Amino acid sequence: MLKGIHKYLLMCFGTVLFTVQANAARIMSNNPIKEDWQCKVVDGEWSCKRAKKPKSVFDKKLTKTEKEKALADDLAWVKKPSYFVGGYYSNDNQFTKALCESKKTDLSYEKSEFDNYGTLIASGNVQVLQCDQELYGNNAIINLNSNNSAIRSLVMAGDVIVKQPSTGIVIRTTELDADMNNGTYSTGEAYFRLAREMPKTRIYDKEHFSGYLRGYAKTFKKESSGDIVLSDGYITSGDPYDNAWKITGNNIDIDTNTHMAYVKNGYFEIQDIPVMYIPYFSHPIDDRRRSGFLYPGFVQNANSGIGISVPYYFNLAPNYDLMLQSVIWSQRGIIENGTFRYMTKYFQGQFEGSLVPYDFKEGKMRGSFTLSTTGQYENINTNFKYEYVSDQNYYNDFSAGNVNLVTKTLLDREFDLTYTNDYVDSGLTVLDYGVVNPLLTVDNTPYAKLPEVKLNLTSDGYTPDYLTLSAQTLNTFFYKTAGPANTNPGAPQGTNVNAFRAYESPKIAFNFNKTWGYLNPSLEVPIRYYQLKNSPTDTIQFANSSVTSVLPIFNIDAGAYFDKDYTNENGTYTSTLHPRLFYTYIPYQDQTNIPLFDTSLQNEQYMQMFQVNRFTGYDRINNANQLTYAIEASTTNQDNGTTLASAKIGQMAYFADRKVNLCQGNSACPNPGLMDPFSTDTFSPIMSSFEFQVMKNIYLSAQVNYRVNQQNVDYQVYQLSYKDENENIFNVSYNNIANNWNSLTQQQIAEGAKPQPQETITLSTVLNITDHWGIAALWNYNFQQKQIANIFAGLQYNAKSWAVRALWQKTAYTNQDPNNPTLLGPLVNTYMFEFELKGLGGIGNTSDISSRLQQINGYQVGEWGNGI
């Protein structure tokens, strides 16, 4: 076309400028591909041309290596061997930044000719620079507007490169036809790159992923709507030297309004070999939510076989959406899952439901759902949750080994309404539970609260700083339906006493706080009133129908601070010594005539020494005449606030035996001393808590209780952790608890059972062996039951533009006996797999792998990939 016009042209030489004089911003010294361009001043103006003409990526005679090099140059790929992906894409706006302010166009070339109609024919290093747009080519036909002050349209040919710095778009093509007024253009054969916003995770940082999609098309067209239409092309996230995978298509449409890419009639290729036909494919080109099919998932479950899931996402509105997922199980049939989420100005929540229309194995319909919502208006907050499941085995059959669901014995059904400000904390709670396993005894089923009303008041802000007056009010109606009376097969139905409890606790506290220490005495008087509704079928009988309890609690908390600052070559530090005394007096009161509604006994730990009551809940208040004496020491880095070392050690001296226990009514407590064999000791164990940064990246923590009278350690928990800058993790944890009160069920407490010991060890690691290979593993062993409780091993291979992960897990679930939640069952296998195309998501269920990795102490979501 250019050759045919030459005979009508008037020859001229030089450069036409529509802008101010060229400025220093056009100097190429900062251009990452400066080896291909050379700029110098000619007649007071900048002139840029390639120092050495590169090879054309469209040259059919190029070798594979030469073509990759040419493409890398054209797409502004800058080599950086230290990066895992080998480099990065340059995206420099230095040539057009000034033009955005002046709103002018910079046109330059080596030779030009005008025809009779004012059309400019330019040749030789033609450059058109506008705000946020760069055009480079060998030749151009340029149509100017009526006063020659701007370009109306142009046709450019020969080594054409189009750049848009703001979006990162770069196009390398053979020819370009552009309308500068409406921003439309079309090209011939073209290579391109598009920016893709990625999550900030380890394998998606700038060293491990380019952050771009690139591709090829026979034609590349940008329409007036801004949409991009490609024909006979492909897309991939690999750099110009990486062709590991591609998604090809006869038609590829990129909708810039919905930010979606649509591929029709294509293939998924690995190393240019088609491996899967794709009739239709859609995916967002940014991180915003879009309607469409998501990647299929593969699930394995020992009870249901293999499941293949096909999810579809509906982006219904900015504030609500819907996910539908069909799963075809090889042994069960089809299950339909749905998740609806919504958000308004004052409320947000979601509905999750699943339905098995017909289970092939069970021959019936099955399902479950969870409805949850929260709300907030100024100082008012609400919370609602309701769970339902059709049968006790549903979670075990369809949860793919999710331990939180497989071991679930109770369904939450709760509504909360609270109002809080600086002086008032009030609320209404309605709480009930659904029982998953009907073998759960009535004693082990928690009480419903129908309802519970609280009102807490404080004088903060009204009284002097040294004085605080407060009152706590909690009124609850406890209710429980009938259930199995015991764990024997065919046990009769039994009940537990229902009751109303009123709890009032006024308190006066003095706060004498100084920079060097504190003295804080307080007096609290809990008043409890119970109205019991006894029944002959109650498993535990109580003689009285009403009970009143009044107990004063006197407490003094005192301590001092001794600080010392010092500086060394590593920074400035503060060492603090904190001796502390904590005295409590509570008179004894027989409370066996009060049922246990929400009360249990805690394990002895260091921080428990500074609590006035060793029982949780409100149904037991221990008698006390005891003094805690302790000393705490710590060293803190003043530069970053980190604690290098912390040591705490203390003991309690008892001036009276502990007489209050968990016996209630006529329950089996033949020898209450068996429950607490140390109730007559004069001293508690020596309790300690330690945390040390052993060296860089290595941390050690320990909690140890040493009982002097028996000369043994009856509580010990150790944790050794390592995590470095490369996110390598290694943990060893060991715990040995001689009397684990936390493991006792309510029925075991009623029977006067002695707390059982607990001893376990856990090893876990995430090890990035190389930039490519990584492993994750966890091993947990239960010494008391002499078996593995949980073990998994995962393997990841991370390539430049894709990653693959596989994980195997073997778990002994604690769902064998709902009345013995510590009993381990047989080991069950679960397998998980994910294949991820960087920039386009993955195939597989990332939540399954992620939930396992999060069991490793120190692991953070994203360190193994997007959502992992």
UniProtKB/Swiss-Prot annotation:
Keywords: Cell outer membrane, Membrane, Signal. Transmembrane segments: none annotated. Residues 1-24 form the signal peptide. One of its GO terms (cellular component) is cell outer membrane. It holds the Pfam family LptD_N. The keyword Transferase does not apply. Together with LptE, is involved in the assembly of lipopolysaccharide (LPS) at the surface of the outer membrane. Component of the lipopolysaccharide transport and assembly complex. Interacts with LptE and LptA. Belongs to the LptD family. This is LPS-assembly protein LptD.
